[in-house]
């Protein structure tokens, strides 16, 4: 690990602090996930799915949108790995 010459020494061991920071590429992955939630409607859908699993029709009713519009947002969230889905009989539930 490189030596860091800090302008102020506050008594902390900078190497111990830096060991806790994930690699830069991990932050790029996290930033990408946050970008997917940058659309307020998509964030509302995500919030709903954090609390329950639901079908497209119920999500659409809850956020006052058409089912195709909700499907589009679900597709983006699923493609980015933020949510998943499972089949229950003829229903496809987003989780």
Features from the language model and the residues they span:
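Hydrophobic alpha-helical segments with strong N-terminal bias
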Residues: 19-22, 63, 82
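N-terminal helix-turn-helix DNA-binding core of bacterial DNA-binding proteins
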Residues: 24-68, 90-95
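Intrinsically disordered, low-complexity cationic segments
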Residues: 7, 71-72
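Beta-hairpin "wing" of winged helix-turn-helix
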Residues: 78-88, 95
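Alpha-helical residues within the helix-turn-helix
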Residues: 61, 72, 78-79
């Amino acid at each position: 690990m490189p030596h860091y010459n800090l302008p102020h020494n506050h008594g902390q061991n900078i190497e111990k602090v830096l060991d806790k920071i994930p690699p830069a590429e991990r932050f790029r992955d996290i930033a990408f996930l946050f970008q997917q939630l940058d659309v307020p409607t998509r964030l509302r859908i995500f919030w709903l799915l954090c609390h329950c699993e639901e079908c497209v029709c119920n999500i659409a009713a809850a956020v006052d949108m058409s089912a195709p519009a909700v499907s589009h947002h679900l597709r983006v969230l699923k493609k980015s790995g933020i949510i998943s889905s499972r089949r229950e009989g003829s229903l496809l539930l987003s989780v």
